[in-house]
Amino acid sequence: MSFRSAEGVSIMQALAMTVAEIPVFLYSTFGQSIFSQLKLSPSLKKVLFATALGSVALALTAHQLKRRGRKRKQTLGKEAQKPVGIPEQLLRSSRPASLKRGPVPARQMMSPSTRSNDTLSGVSSIAQSKHSSSSHSIASMRVPSSPNQSVNAGAAWEAEPVAEEPAVGEDANAENLYLMGMELFEEALRKWELALNIRHRSHSRASASNSQGSELVERHSPEVRNHQFAERLETLLHRAYHLQEDFGSTIPPDSLLADLESEGTLILPTLGSSHPIQDDDATTVTSDDSFFSAAELFETFSLEDSFHLLKPAALYEEALSLVKDGDVACRSLRTELLECYSDQDFLAKLHCVRQAFQVLLLDETHRMFFMETGKQMISGLLVKANKSPKAFLESYEDMLQYTQREETWPVSKMELEGRGVVCMNFFDIVLDFILMDAFEDLESPPSSVVAVLRNRWLSDSFKETALATACWSVLKAKRRLLMVPDGFIAHFYVISEHVSPVLAFGFLGPHQHLSEVCTIFKQQIVQYLKDMFDHDKVRFTSVPSLAEDILRLSHRRADILMGYLGIENLPETNGALPKSPCQAESGNLDASGQQD
């Protein structure tokens, strides 16, 4: 053992001596010839040679260490650029991590188009958070270039598996794409609104300059093109708002969209009609109260700034000026029901329609047409429900006789004004107060009535009797509270006692055929009113032209309803059931059989 250790020591000594003799060997071989020309002492020559040799060795060592460090950095960079292994199901769902691990209100999702500086900041954060310039989709996320994170990232993802079915992931992915598309659509709306606002500002400046009498002829052609462009842009915006209202709520409430909305991620910046649209780098809104729909955003623009008629309408323009002055009132706004552009648009058209009906009803022929049409429609509806129209016809005649007496008009006006009717006009009394209110009441029936009609253990006849009894009791109770026991409202309640149970059972009852009849009746009435408020269906140029168009629409809708109800001639007051074409044909066959 000692021999082996001694042998090892001798080998190490020999190697050390060999290494130590290398500089001496190099000096004796090369150093003497190099330093022979220098007049120095031998010891100084050895020192200079050792210094030069050490410097060369040190430089070679530093170069080698530098190359090794560069290779190590390249290796670490390649490892850091590799994406972390994200589960496939999480990629499909594309949900932020905050939605998976727990509710974090400060987490936000931005629009995928925020990578461009030209986009508006449509989505903002609730709390202070860092906004990235890239898309915030979970599929494009990368882990920072840290060695520690790159080593343990895969284990972290594997430690938190996502329990989600593949089909659910695909649905969530589709819903996320829908959400991104809606965000882009809202951004397009903002751009169009900005373009329209700029166009109106330029148009106002151009008109101001033209009013001073400078360059009127030269500006005429560009102004016409600008006006046409603004009209097309307004039409596009109007259709886009309707499209967003129709398809803005098609995602189920338990989906990704509902989750995002619950965290307040769809927040739009506030916008006022008197302030210009903010730039892209403007401060975003951080309040949940700033969320509003496209319809509300559309209403913030004034009518004079965003709506121009495509065809001349002097009567409408005059009515619109009265509306702006606050001289036109109504009982209830029907803007959405009649598909008007805004409340001002509805009021202006309402004022025109009132004037047209005043002109129409000056003619005795037109008055008789409207009276007979109403009687025939309600009688035909009762016949479709297998009810006798005798009592209704008698009450209807009493009502007409009461309204034709001029001494009753002040009392009727007082009663109707107490119900909110602001104008004694055919539209306000018959179409709005009677028909539209009846349709609205049938859309929200009492819960007790709905419970009876949905009870499967009750027969249809019992349901119809119970509903009729409820209507009669309510109407009789209202009649006892009237200030004028034999006035206009009292006569109206008498008619309602015969018509309301049939309409209620038709709209709410189990009979499909009667429900279809009542639904078509309502659709025709509502469409008749919509056509009356449509610039494409009637002319708002003058009162006679509008009255002529309304009369034409009235005849057309009356023909449609009479043809659908299958009744041509109705009895006046004899109470006999009107015969449908089938019943008339069978009656003729019976008569011919008796003659034979």
Curated annotation (Swiss-Prot):
It comes from the Eukaryota. It is a multi-pass membrane protein. Residues 110-123, 143-152, 583-596 have a biased composition (Polar residues). Coiled coil: none annotated. InterPro entries: Miga (IPR019392). The keyword Transmembrane applies. Belongs to the mitoguardin family. Regulator of mitochondrial fusion: acts by forming homo- and heterodimers at the mitochondrial outer membrane and facilitating the formation of pld6/MitoPLD dimers. May act by regulating phospholipid metabolism via pld6/MitoPLD. Homodimer and heterodimer; forms heterodimers with miga1. This is Mitoguardin 2. The lineage of its organism: Eukaryota, Metazoa, Chordata, Craniata, Vertebrata.
